[in-house]
């Protein structure tokens, strides 16, 4: 039997653990008869399941007859890419043809006699979206791992225009906290502040335990030990499952390899992107077993007003949880050991 787990980022595994509440929140909002929100941004650390969740939502909407779904590459000209995707989509291509929309200027189709060609990308997209609206169809655009580049700035400005013109276009994007924060602080793009952000938190521990128990046919105590080793971090769930599968279900035999995978695939990158002060605070958290903020500050010799900005930033990055008042803990499994070994 094939290994049901995967080590590939963004690939939907054979044995996923879904996030039903957050998934349904987005699907229900986008499909509501009266539209009051046309954009969601999914954030979280690398390996938290952002792409998998976005893919699942896109799949659900693609199955509906009144939806067109396209995916855009954030590293390329997004408006040009959007027009090309609309032109190559069967539903939109039929609309373009029947409405006699001349896109020959962009290299799509042939010139239509008696019809002036459209020469502005944004105008061409608006024309197609207006026809989609008349046919009671909606368009979902997905963009994975948005970054603050010129293509994204132009696209975000155009998307704002589409929404203002009451066009049936919806955006679902994923991104790391720092990239989203950088983008929404751009002049003229502050509307992104108002877009709902869904920060992916750890998976339900019971769900992780049940998954391991059923796949490996192990007793509850062993499944619980495995689940605790992952802390609900989706990539860790996949890595531990993958390695355990390859070792005939013996998870104790793979713990060193498991830790190495987490370090090389994720933690090295996370650590490299932290500032020196972030790292000092992270070390303080790692060295304070109780997790009490007061004890961490005393250990570091930092006042509250000096400590809090770094605590909040680590929380927004998804590295630290502050759900229990007065305490902070790492959300990532074995990250304490990594921090101490690397600082």
What are these regions (language model features)?
Residues 35-56:
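Walker A/P-loop nucleotide-binding motif
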Residues 40, 55, 59-77:
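Conserved catalytic segments around the Walker B and adjacent sensor/switch elements
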Residues 216-267:
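Amphipathic alpha-helical "lid/sensor" segments that cap RecA-like P-loop NTPase cores
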Residues 114-178, 186:
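Conserved Walker B catalytic segment
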Residues 178-195:
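Short regulatory helix/loop adjacent to the ATP-binding pocket of P-loop NTPases
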Residues 195-222:
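Conserved small helical "lid"/interfacial subdomain of P-loop NTPases
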Residues 2-4, 263-343:
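C-terminal leucine-rich, beta-strand-based interaction scaffolds used for sensing/assembly
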Residues 1-40, 334-335, 341:
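A short, basic N-terminal segment
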């Amino acid at each position: 039997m094939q290994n049901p787990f995967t080590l590939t980022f963004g690939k939907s595994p054979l044995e996923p653990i879904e996030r039903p509440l957050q998934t349904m929140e987005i699907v229900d909002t986008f499909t509501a008869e009266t539209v009051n929100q046309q954009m969601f941004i999914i954030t979280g650390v690398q390996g938290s399941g952002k792409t998998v969740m976005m893919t699942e939502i896109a799949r659900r909407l693609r199955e509906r007859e009144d939806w067109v779904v396209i995916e855009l590459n954030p590293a390329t000209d997004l408006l040009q890419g959007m027009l090309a995707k609309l032109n190559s989509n069967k539903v939109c291509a039929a609309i373009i043809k029947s409405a006699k929309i001349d896109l020959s200027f962009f290299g799509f189709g042939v010139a239509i006699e008696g019809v002036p060609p459209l020469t502005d990308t944004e105008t061409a997209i608006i024309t197609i979206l207006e026809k989609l609206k008349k046919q009671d169809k909606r368009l979902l655009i997905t963009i994975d791992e948005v970054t603050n580049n010129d293509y994204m700035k132009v696209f975000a400005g155009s998307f704002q225009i589409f929404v203002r013109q009451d066009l049936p276009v919806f955006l679902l994007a994923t991104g790391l906290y720092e990239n989203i924060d950088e983008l929404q602080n751009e002049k003229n793009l502050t509307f992104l502040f108002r877009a709902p952000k869904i920060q992916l938190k750890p998976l339900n521990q019971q769900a992780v335990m049940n998954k391991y128990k059923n796949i490996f046919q192990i007793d509850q105590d062993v499944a619980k030990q495995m689940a605790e080793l992952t802390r609900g971090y989706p990539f860790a769930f996949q890595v531990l499952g993958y390695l355990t599968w390859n070792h005939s279900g013996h998870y104790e035999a793979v713990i060193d390899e498991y830790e190495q995978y987490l370090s090389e695939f994720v933690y090295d990158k996370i650590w490299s992107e932290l500032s020196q002060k972030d790292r000092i605070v992270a070390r303080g958290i790692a060295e304070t077993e109780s997790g009490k903020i007061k004890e961490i500050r005393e250990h570091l010799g930092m006042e509250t007003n000096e400590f809090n900005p770094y605590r909040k930033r680590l929380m927004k990055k998804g590295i630290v949880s502050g759900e229990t008042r007065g305490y902070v803990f790492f959300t990532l499994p074995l990250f304490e050991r990594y921090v101490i070994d690397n600082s």
